[in-house]
Amino acid sequence: MKKLLITLLIVASIVACGSQQSQKRDSLQRVVVEPAQYGYVVKNVYPHSTKSYTQGLQFVNGVLWEGTGEWGKSVLQKVDLESGKCEVLARLPKSEFGEGITVLGDKVYQLTWTNNVAHVYDLKGKLIKNERYSGEGWGLTTDGKMLYMSDGSTYIYKVNPETFKREGKITVTLRGHAIEYINELEWIEGKIWANVYTTHEILIINPETGVVEGVVSFANLLKEEDTTADTDVFNGIAYDKEQKRIFVTGKNWNKLYEVEIIKR
């Protein structure tokens, strides 16, 4: 899915960010900040279903929620952390490609890629309603009040959870340059953590300004011996705010990792 072209474009974008020393001022008056650089240490490893094309991941009240993609295979499910066993709560229509999810209060929200519809469920997976939106749906998270949504562009939109209307947006910038292909999102300690599609990097973003304040590299997380022909890109961020645990995985990966972030 759109992977090769996007990878080439992302590489070009990141190279430009690293090599240019200055840029002309634009109408956004972007703030140039040198982001902190982080690596990781694996704390625990858990099984993950290789049938789960992970699009969204969230850990809430001891429950790991996962939304998966692919035409005809997209689901909303709960995952037992220790065993990796999946309990499918809802299956999307075969005409829909599932994307990001988030849990807010007693509702679960799930985006679709190109169908312009978000499904809203109760905590048992019963469909409550559908909400329409323009453009593509990619990542979704919440600060506990509002939703934050990505569409693969440089923007993250602030969305009203009751009406699904956009009430604002930020442009994600790295060293003053707008970064595209913002994908899976997670709200962690007042910041938006976002995967850049097809890369092993997560950006730590100021939700007010869009400025990238940190970059976490997850290079070499999945070992070659753990890959198969179906193994796809790094994707999926979840945060257990009670125990301060961070979980990451990828599409059709056989492992889900609990990681500690280490500043370089």
Residue ranges and their predicted role:
Residues T50-V60, K94-L104, Y133-G144, S150, ...:
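Beta-rich, blade/repeat-based domains predominating
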Residues E66-E70, V108-N115, M149-S153, A194-T198, ...:
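Conserved beta-strand positions in repeat-built beta-propeller and related beta-rich domains
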Residues R30-K51, L81-E87:
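A short helix->beta-strand "capping" segment at the edge of beta-propeller domains
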Residues V42-P47, K85-R91, G125-E131, G168-H177, ...:
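A short beta-strand motif characteristic of beta-propeller blades
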Residues S13-A16:
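C-terminal motif of bacterial Sec signal peptides marking the signal peptidase cleavage site
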Residues V79-G84, D122-K126, N160-F164, N206-G210, ...:
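Short loop/turn segments that connect beta-strands within beta-propeller blades
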Residues G18-Q21:
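Bacterial signal peptide processing site
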Residues K43-V75, A90-T102, W138-G139, G250-L256:
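Beta-strand-rich domains and repeat architectures in extracellular enzymes and scaffolds
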